[in-house]
Amino acid sequence: SRLFRELEMPLSYVLYSMEKEGILVKPEELHLYGEALNGRIAELETSIHEQAGGEFNINSPKQLGEVLFEKMQIPGGKKTKTGYSTAADVLDKLAPQYPIIKDIQEYRGLTKLKSTYADGLAAYIGEDSRIHTNFNQTITATGRLSSTEPNLQNIPMRMELGRRIRKVFVPDENCIFMDADYSQIELRVLAHMSGDEQLIEAYKMDEDIHRITASKVFHTPFEEVTDLQRRNAKAVNFGIVYGISSFGLSQDLSISTKEAKGYIDEYFKTYPGIKTFLDKLVSDAKEKGYCESMFGRRRPVPELK
């Protein structure tokens, strides 16, 4: 097929050369990074114990749940068979009101950074001071690449200390790193494949697509769209691409399910071609047992049959 001949086979040679070349790292920078993580982790540990009024194993969900929801009497605890849940979604809702929760979230993030990157990457540095990851071409269901041993496609960006790991990776002499990123590629592909005239016209205007959507969905003049309306429209724009439900959107925006459903319904009124396109995608997949990309890549979805 065209996908195999023109895309997959030529790409295999590119990936081989990338794996062979590897990426240059500075072991001393990685060591300093680990030291910085250790220092901040120790500070957080002390702070958490002081706020809790005593020492306990922060890494134990059982102990952590008992401290937060019994000893400290923080409301909102969810009891499970093994004790109180301290999952990320539970802590996310409590973090704005309780400083100890924010510290616990940061502690968890930094301990993961330490084990995965500060300690984990060191084991993969070769004699050439490079890390040679494996790029997996045919493992993911969607056709995207994945990276293993180690995973270099998931270098953290959200936390300040997470971003510092990037200093460990350096370009070769007389070279630089470059970053190229498509602008709103998912929405542009959706506009192309759905043929929705309103969305295509919005892109032709070369204005802020999320502000345009907010203006249309919330029936507000473009110049008067608030930052909150734009943020909500952005969540709907990208959520629709990935089949978000009214419940999922309500969780993302901290609004009621009814209000979220209203946003989605209004979105489909604004861009009717998208609704038609998405419905056809589902009906075709039910009939064929797979969906297909613009390039002919098929993804089986037997659960729809």
Show where each model-derived region lies:
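Gly/Ser/Thr-rich helix-start
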Residues: 144, 220, 240, 244, ...
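Function-dense linear segments that define catalytic or interfacial modules
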Residues: 137-222
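Generic long, charged, amphipathic alpha-helical segments
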Residues: 205-229, 294-305
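Amphipathic, charged-and-aliphatic alpha-helical interface segments
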Residues: 225-243
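Short, contiguous acidic/charged loop-to-helix segments that flank catalytic cores in large enzymes
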Residues: 122-126, 199-201, 224
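Short acidic-hydrophobic surface loop/beta-edge motif
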Residues: 124, 138, 168-170, 290-294
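Conserved ATP-utilizing enzyme core subdomain
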Residues: 281-300
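Conserved "right-hand" nucleotidyltransferase catalytic core of DNA-directed polymerases
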Residues: 1-160, 176, 183-186, 229, ...
